[in-house]
Amino acid sequence: MAGYQLWSPWTPLDESFQWLRHTTPTPSSKHPFKASPCFPHTPSDLEVQLCFQEVTLVLDSPFLESGVSPKLPCHTSELRTMNNKGLVRKPQPIRLSGVDSVFGRVITAQPPKWTGTFRVSDKSAFCKIISREHQWPIGLKEPQIQMTVTMCKQMLRSILLLYATYKKCTFALQHSK
């Protein structure tokens, strides 16, 4: 299964976002969503993997260790600020190698395609929402069932439109100069 990530491989547009993912430049691939094999693993990747193995792990960012100079110029005092309650760190995004790292098993990362009937594969994340064994609650009348199905179709269409827009925007941002 091809990997998918929340952040595209390195592009010149990322110069101002280096603090977000603590990475060094890597060549960008042609496809904005496929993971690059040379993309470095971040501490948050390991944290996500161990989280679903029920292992607790606390990782400090290598850029925050004392006595070590930051690799990038933007990793200075802006990376951490002090307030009355203690240390505040900027959040690190998590790169996913597929939806399996979220759900704990191998499933398809793409949403189901609309073919006129709603079919869901056993390995799809959507099988948790609608399954073949799903039974309608007793007492629903036909108009209520039709209204519920219509609402589900509209929500699925909205999700698919948002997903397509996200893909197009990411692709356009990666390839703009």
Curated annotation (Swiss-Prot):
Instruction: Return any one Pfam family short name.
Output: FANCD2OS
InterPro entries in alphabetical order: FANCD2OS (IPR027966)
Could you tell me the superkingdom of the organism this chain comes from? Answer: Eukaryota
Q: Which PANTHER family match?
A: FANCD2 OPPOSITE STRAND PROTEIN
Name-wise, this protein is: FANCD2 opposite strand protein
